Amino acid sequence: MTEATTTAAPVETPLPEATLQPDTGEESFHEHEARTMALTSHETAFMAELAPHAGATPRRGLRFVNVYRLIRTSLPLHEHETLVGGEGEQTAYRALLTQLAIVTGAPAIAPVYFDHLAALAAGNLAEAREYKGLADLIAALGEDDRVTASTEAAPLLGALQILRDSVAPQGLGNDPALLATLHNTASVARRYSFTARPH
Protein backbone atom coordinates (compact mmCIF):
# COMPACT_ATOMS: atom_id res chain seq x y z
CA MET A 1 0.00 0.00 0.00
CA THR A 2 1.39 3.33 -1.01
CA GLU A 3 1.25 6.09 1.58
CA ALA A 4 -0.20 9.39 0.41
CA THR A 5 2.33 12.15 0.37
CA THR A 6 1.29 15.50 1.77
CA THR A 7 2.66 18.86 0.76
CA ALA A 8 3.09 21.42 3.48
CA ALA A 9 1.30 24.68 2.90
CA PRO A 10 3.68 27.45 1.90
CA VAL A 11 4.70 29.69 4.75
CA GLU A 12 4.68 33.42 4.01
CA THR A 13 8.07 34.88 4.78
CA PRO A 14 7.80 38.25 6.50
CA LEU A 15 9.50 41.19 4.81
CA PRO A 16 12.69 42.43 6.39
CA GLU A 17 12.11 44.97 9.11
CA ALA A 18 13.86 47.69 7.13
CA THR A 19 11.06 47.69 4.56
CA LEU A 20 8.35 47.80 7.23
CA GLN A 21 9.50 50.99 8.95
CA PRO A 22 6.70 53.51 9.39
CA ASP A 23 6.61 56.61 7.23
CA THR A 24 7.50 59.46 9.55
CA GLY A 25 6.84 62.12 6.96
CA GLU A 26 10.39 63.39 7.36
CA GLU A 27 12.68 63.95 4.40
CA SER A 28 15.79 61.89 4.02
CA PHE A 29 19.14 63.65 3.86
CA HIS A 30 19.30 63.19 0.09
CA GLU A 31 15.75 64.48 -0.42
CA HIS A 32 16.52 67.52 1.72
CA GLU A 33 19.76 68.15 -0.15
CA ALA A 34 18.03 67.89 -3.52
CA ARG A 35 15.33 70.37 -2.55
CA THR A 36 17.69 72.89 -1.00
CA MET A 37 20.08 72.77 -3.96
CA ALA A 38 17.28 73.45 -6.46
CA LEU A 39 17.56 77.17 -7.14
CA THR A 40 14.50 79.24 -7.91
CA SER A 41 14.13 81.17 -11.15
CA HIS A 42 14.58 84.39 -9.14
CA GLU A 43 17.95 83.23 -7.82
CA THR A 44 19.24 82.03 -11.18
CA ALA A 45 18.13 85.25 -12.90
CA PHE A 46 19.93 87.42 -10.35
CA MET A 47 23.03 85.21 -10.51
CA ALA A 48 23.09 85.65 -14.28
CA GLU A 49 23.06 89.44 -13.84
CA LEU A 50 25.92 89.29 -11.34
CA ALA A 51 27.99 86.72 -13.22
CA PRO A 52 30.03 89.23 -15.29
CA HIS A 53 31.19 90.85 -12.04
CA ALA A 54 31.91 87.59 -10.19
CA GLY A 55 35.21 86.95 -11.91
CA ALA A 56 36.89 87.15 -15.28
CA THR A 57 37.54 83.40 -15.48
CA PRO A 58 35.18 80.41 -15.75
CA ARG A 59 36.77 79.00 -12.60
CA ARG A 60 35.76 82.03 -10.54
CA GLY A 61 32.29 81.97 -12.04
CA LEU A 62 31.88 78.33 -11.10
CA ARG A 63 33.09 79.05 -7.58
CA PHE A 64 30.50 81.82 -7.26
CA VAL A 65 27.68 79.42 -8.17
CA ASN A 66 28.94 76.49 -6.11
CA VAL A 67 29.52 78.50 -2.95
CA TYR A 68 25.98 79.86 -3.06
CA ARG A 69 24.60 76.34 -3.54
CA LEU A 70 26.66 75.15 -0.58
CA ILE A 71 25.34 77.93 1.64
CA ARG A 72 21.79 77.30 0.52
CA THR A 73 22.02 73.57 1.23
CA SER A 74 23.12 74.29 4.79
CA LEU A 75 19.91 76.22 5.52
CA PRO A 76 16.80 74.56 6.97
CA LEU A 77 13.91 74.48 4.49
CA HIS A 78 11.81 76.90 6.53
CA GLU A 79 14.49 79.56 6.08
CA HIS A 80 14.28 79.46 2.29
CA GLU A 81 11.07 81.52 2.34
CA THR A 82 12.87 84.18 4.35
CA LEU A 83 15.85 84.03 2.03
CA VAL A 84 14.05 84.32 -1.32
CA GLY A 85 10.29 84.67 -0.87
CA GLY A 86 7.57 83.17 -3.02
CA GLU A 87 7.96 85.86 -5.68
CA GLY A 88 11.65 86.58 -5.16
CA GLU A 89 10.76 89.71 -3.22
CA GLN A 90 13.14 89.15 -0.31
CA THR A 91 16.43 91.04 -0.30
CA ALA A 92 18.48 88.51 1.69
CA TYR A 93 19.40 86.27 -1.26
CA ARG A 94 20.26 89.30 -3.38
CA ALA A 95 22.43 90.79 -0.64
CA LEU A 96 24.22 87.48 -0.14
CA LEU A 97 24.74 86.83 -3.85
CA THR A 98 26.03 90.37 -4.39
CA GLN A 99 28.62 89.94 -1.67
CA LEU A 100 29.65 86.52 -2.93
CA ALA A 101 30.20 88.15 -6.33
CA ILE A 102 32.35 90.80 -4.63
CA VAL A 103 34.58 88.36 -2.73
CA THR A 104 34.95 86.28 -5.90
CA GLY A 105 35.35 89.02 -8.49
CA ALA A 106 37.08 91.72 -6.42
CA PRO A 107 39.01 89.84 -3.72
CA ALA A 108 41.78 92.43 -3.33
CA ILE A 109 39.45 95.28 -2.40
CA ALA A 110 36.67 93.25 -0.78
CA PRO A 111 38.07 94.14 2.69
CA VAL A 112 37.68 97.84 1.83
CA TYR A 113 34.04 97.21 0.91
CA PHE A 114 33.34 95.38 4.16
CA ASP A 115 35.01 98.15 6.19
CA HIS A 116 32.78 100.81 4.61
CA LEU A 117 29.70 98.62 5.06
CA ALA A 118 30.45 98.04 8.75
CA ALA A 119 31.05 101.74 9.37
CA LEU A 120 27.79 102.83 7.75
CA ALA A 121 25.79 100.06 9.44
CA ALA A 122 27.23 101.04 12.83
CA GLY A 123 26.40 104.68 12.13
CA ASN A 124 22.77 103.74 11.49
CA LEU A 125 22.63 102.21 14.97
CA ALA A 126 24.35 105.11 16.73
CA GLU A 127 22.34 107.41 18.99
CA ALA A 128 22.93 110.53 16.89
CA ARG A 129 22.39 108.77 13.60
CA GLU A 130 21.91 109.97 10.05
CA TYR A 131 20.49 107.00 8.21
CA LYS A 132 22.58 105.70 5.32
CA GLY A 133 21.72 103.27 2.57
CA LEU A 134 23.17 101.48 -0.45
CA ALA A 135 23.51 104.67 -2.49
CA ASP A 136 25.64 106.16 0.28
CA LEU A 137 27.78 103.02 0.39
CA ILE A 138 28.38 103.14 -3.36
CA ALA A 139 29.26 106.84 -3.13
CA ALA A 140 31.72 106.24 -0.28
CA LEU A 141 33.45 103.47 -2.20
CA GLY A 142 33.63 105.64 -5.30
CA GLU A 143 35.55 108.26 -3.31
CA ASP A 144 38.03 105.80 -1.78
CA ASP A 145 41.40 105.85 -3.55
CA ARG A 146 41.96 102.19 -2.67
CA VAL A 147 38.93 101.37 -4.79
CA THR A 148 39.30 103.83 -7.64
CA ALA A 149 42.97 102.92 -8.16
CA SER A 150 42.20 99.20 -8.33
CA THR A 151 41.50 97.18 -11.45
CA GLU A 152 38.76 95.51 -9.41
CA ALA A 153 36.74 98.72 -9.00
CA ALA A 154 34.48 97.83 -11.94
CA PRO A 155 33.34 94.42 -10.65
CA LEU A 156 32.88 95.75 -7.11
CA LEU A 157 30.84 98.80 -8.04
CA GLY A 158 29.10 96.94 -10.86
CA ALA A 159 27.80 94.24 -8.53
CA LEU A 160 26.50 96.84 -6.08
CA GLN A 161 24.79 98.77 -8.88
CA ILE A 162 23.01 95.61 -10.02
CA LEU A 163 21.75 95.13 -6.47
CA ARG A 164 20.60 98.74 -6.34
CA ASP A 165 18.76 98.41 -9.65
CA SER A 166 17.07 95.20 -8.51
CA VAL A 167 15.59 96.77 -5.37
CA ALA A 168 14.69 100.13 -6.95
CA PRO A 169 11.16 98.98 -7.92
CA GLN A 170 10.57 98.21 -4.22
CA GLY A 171 11.77 101.67 -3.21
CA LEU A 172 14.77 100.23 -1.36
CA GLY A 173 17.57 101.85 -3.35
CA ASN A 174 18.79 103.81 -0.34
CA ASP A 175 16.78 102.21 2.45
CA PRO A 176 18.76 101.60 5.67
CA ALA A 177 17.00 98.22 5.96
CA LEU A 178 18.83 96.98 2.87
CA LEU A 179 22.14 98.14 4.32
CA ALA A 180 21.29 96.18 7.48
CA THR A 181 20.57 93.09 5.37
CA LEU A 182 23.93 93.46 3.64
CA HIS A 183 25.62 93.75 7.02
CA ASN A 184 23.74 90.73 8.41
CA THR A 185 24.74 88.51 5.49
CA ALA A 186 28.29 89.86 5.16
CA SER A 187 29.78 87.40 7.64
CA VAL A 188 28.50 84.47 5.57
CA ALA A 189 30.06 85.80 2.37
CA ARG A 190 33.32 86.62 4.14
CA ARG A 191 33.77 83.01 5.25
CA TYR A 192 34.31 82.11 1.61
CA SER A 193 36.77 84.94 0.93
CA PHE A 194 40.53 84.45 0.79
CA THR A 195 41.17 88.09 1.71
CA ALA A 196 38.25 89.31 3.84
CA ARG A 197 37.48 86.54 6.31
CA PRO A 198 36.01 87.75 9.62
CA HIS A 199 38.40 87.74 12.56
Predicted regions and their residues:
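The feature marks long, low-complexity, polar/acidic/proline-rich intrinsically disordered regions embedded
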Residues: M1-H199
